[in-house]
Design a protein with these regions (language model features):
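Mid/C-terminal beta-alpha module of Rossmann-like enzyme folds, strongest
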Residues: 2, 15-18, 225-281
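N-terminal Rossmann NAD(P)H-binding glycine-rich loop of SDR-like oxidoreductase domains
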Residues: 3-25
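NAD(P)H-binding glycine-rich loop region in Rossmannoid oxidoreductase-like domains
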Residues: 32-41, 45-103
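Conserved Rossmann-fold NAD(P)-dependent oxidoreductase catalytic core, especially the SDR/UDP-sugar
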Residues: 81, 85-146
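Conserved beta-loop-beta element that borders a ligand/cofactor-binding pocket
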Residues: 115, 120-121, 157-181
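Substrate-positioning beta->alpha
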Residues: 150-157, 183-198, 209-232, 238
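Conserved C-terminal active-site "lid" loop/helix of NAD(P)H-dependent oxidoreductases
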Residues: 221, 251-255, 275-304
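Amphipathic terminal alpha-helices
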Residues: 308-319
């Protein structure tokens, strides 16, 4: 199968290309920065410099390539996110998820693409109520903190854009918070630095806010890639949560991660002080978000995460 992988130089893209090549797919990998060409080519894909925000260029290139499938992994997430200015740091990614996705879906539909897979997110967008794990049928948060609203709006726009197009099979993968190579939760090596979150934990910059009652559903970067391959091979139109099997309280995973990287336990910060220092949205991420179920993906995609628990993944697979 000929596949156009948009965002090939990103964390998931770099992990995904070799898996697609192993299955004998022909991959054209796009990226905006020409400096990424050698890396994408070394992984086995045909490199292509393409600005997803240039609608005419996207239309022309997709028509020339004539892929059977498009995989949209477009992001522009900075290597270090200032959570106090979450909306600012995610603005370029939000633009790619709205305008870039619109350009890609229009071009794909006009070019006869059969399947379109797009990256979304399951980490915090679900409504923070109830105690059961969130499924694909549950509502997203109708009243997110203001700092998170632009990103949630962009994710909803992306999902609607992909799923409403009738000329191809639209698939949305809601990945959990990622860890492992090329992510912010990664150990360095081979000339690469630690991920920014690991650096901050080592320097005691990430406190445990409040009681740490937020529930996170993590995902190793390798499992994000294998789930994407499974979706390419088997998925029907719809949304799939892609997370591990072990939802985790912040009060459990944050001290454990600190221990795994040889850092001191995180300090505690009361909610009231944290609201003043970093904002209500960070307090919500630490205390309010709910865990996510992967049962649909396991059942319908015949997919199982290799790193079924963040506990093993943090110990063995950060680098």
């Amino acid at each position: 199968m000929k596949i156009l992988l948009a965002g090939a130089s990103g964390a998931i893209g770099q992990t995904l290309i070799p898996l697609l090549i192993q299955q004998q797919h022909e991959v054209v990998g796009t990226f905006r920065n020409p400096a990424h060409a050698a890396r994408v080519q070394s992984l086995g894909a045909t490199p292509l410099v393409l600005d997803a925000l240039d609608a005419r260029a996207v239309t022309d290139r997709v028509a020339q390539i004539k892929p059977q499938a498009v995989i949209n992994q477009l992001t522009a997430i900075p290597s270090r996110i200032d959570l106090r200015h979450f909306d600012r740091d995610f603005a370029p990614t939000n633009q790619l998820r709205t305008e870039g996705t619109r350009n890609l879906t229009t071009a794909a539909a006009n070019a006869g693409v059969e399947k379109f897979i797009a990256q979304s997110f399951a980490g915090w967008p679900y409504a923070p109520r109830g105690i059961t794990l969130k499924t694909e049928e549950d509502d997203l948060d109708p009243t997110p903190p203001p700092q998170l609203k632009p990103s949630l709006d962009a994710l909803e726009t992306l999902e609607h854009t992909v799923l409403r197009e009738s000329r191809f099979t639209g698939i949305v993968l809601r990945y959990g918070p990622l860890y492992g190579p090329h992510t912010s939760v990664a150990l360095g090596g081979n000339g690469l630095p630690d991920g920014s979150m690991i650096e901050d934990i080592r320097h005691h910059k990430i406190p445990l806010i409040g009681q740490g009652t937020g529930v996170w559903s993590f995902l190793h970067i390798h499992d994000a890639a294998t789930a994407t391959v499974a979706a390419l091979n088997q998925a029907q139109r719809g949304i799939y949560n892609i997370v591990d099997d072990d939802p985790a309280l912040v009060s459990e995973w944050l001290p454990y991660l600190a221990e795994c990287v040889g850092a001191k336990p995180p300090m505690h910060l009361p909610n009231a002080i944290a609201r003043m220092m970093v904002g209500e949205h960070v307090v919500a991420l630490m205390n309010d978000i709910r865990g996510v179920s992967n049962e649909k993906a396991k059942r319908e995609l015949a997919w199982t995460p290799k790193w079924a628990s963040w506990r093993q993944g943090f110990r063995e697979a950060l680098g």
